[in-house]
Amino acid sequence: MISVKVPASSANLGAGFDCMGVALKLYNIIEVEEIEKGLIITSSPDDPSIAKDENNLVFRAMKTVFDEVGWYPRGLRINLINEIPLTRGLGSSAACISGGIYAANLLCGGKLSEEEMIYLAAKMEGHPDNSTPAMIGGLVFAVLEDKKVNYIKFVVPARLKFAVFIPDFQLSTEYARNILPKYIEFKDAVFNIGRATLFASAITTGNYELLPAATQDRLHQPYRKKLIPDFDKIVNLSLEAGAKGAFLSGAGPSIIALVDENYEIFEQNVKNALASMDLVANWDFMILEADNSGATVFSVQSTSLKR
């Protein structure tokens, strides 16, 4: 059996629409082994929305590897242990795709390079901002081109924390993407280019005082926040409590605030405020560090049947 741990991820990070993302220390575990025949899929918790047949996203990701290398198991047993909440903007689908590809590559003897796995994951996901950090960890700036993902990975220091606000409702990425306009104004494109560049500079140099400006966006958040009750309240609460910036995580509905080494004070201020605020949704709150490793294998036993 092969056991793979794959992190959650947050995409866009404000202005970096479809090209920036960071891996977070919240994990799914994928356990796979070859069996004599058939396909057996189990999950914990046992969520009925998770397909238990060939439509399962982890299986589909694994099959892309088998198709690519021309090797197929006789049968598969897949067990999914999920901590990443579904359809909350924290990269649950990217974790399934990147983790499935990573596990399948191990199962077939490591025939694909890391670059090839990164490309397959981004191609299946449609964009690299979640799938690439899920695969390799860290803060990633990436673009998907023909047959290749061009990217830069930055190791995020432990002093930068990610305060994650997770509501008690789901929001599908497809719906949140369809609400976006087909065309944008030139000035809004210029606005985002400047902020995305500033964000990259602020993070890589440690100049976190630039983050309030660098996390502003005009391409997706003004439209998507209409789908998220309490969005402005949560963002304003975060900034008033000392966050360096706050933004929608991926397509939402989760919201992330960036905090520094004073995160314990921030955490207490937020918890006190949440207890007294009049909010439409119920919001879970946790503080996470970046995961700089990405998908990792932590258990390998005998995985292949005699042929």
From Swiss-Prot:
Q: Which UniProt keywords apply?
A: Amino-acid biosynthesis, ATP-binding, Cytoplasm, Kinase, Nucleotide-binding, Threonine biosynthesis, Transferase
Annotated Pfam families: GHMP_kinases_C (PF08544), GHMP_kinases_N (PF00288)
The answer to keyword S-adenosyl-L-methionine applying to this record is: no
Q: Which reaction does it catalyse?
A: L-homoserine + ATP = O-phospho-L-homoserine + ADP + H(+)
Q: List the pathway annotation.
A: Amino-acid biosynthesis; L-threonine biosynthesis; L-threonine from L-aspartate: step 4/5
Record-annotated residues binding ATP? 85-95
Any one GO CC term of this protein is:
cytoplasm
Question: Recorded E.C. number(s)?
Answer: 2.7.1.39
* GO BP of this protein: threonine biosynthetic process
InterPro entries linked: GHMP_kinase_C_dom, GHMP_kinase_C_sf, GHMP_kinase_N_dom, GHMP_knse_ATP-bd_CS, Homoserine_kinase, Ribosomal_Su5_D2-typ_SF, Ribsml_uS5_D2-typ_fold_subgr
Molecular-function annotations in GO: ATP binding; homoserine kinase activity
Q: Where in the cell is it found?
A: Cytoplasm
Main localisation: cytoplasm
Q: Which domain of life is it from?
A: Bacteria
Note the SUPFAM superfamilies from the entry: GHMP Kinase, C-terminal domain (SSF55060), Ribosomal protein S5 domain 2-like (SSF54211)
Q: Which PROSITE patterns match?
A: GHMP_KINASES_ATP
Say if the entry is tagged with keyword Aminoacyl-tRNA synthetase.
no
Identify the HAMAP family for this entry.
Homoser_kinase
Give the family per the record. Belongs to the GHMP kinase family. Homoserine kinase subfamily.
Role description: Catalyzes the ATP-dependent phosphorylation of L-homoserine to L-homoserine phosphate.
Q: What is this protein called?
A: Homoserine kinase
Gene that specifies this protein: thrB
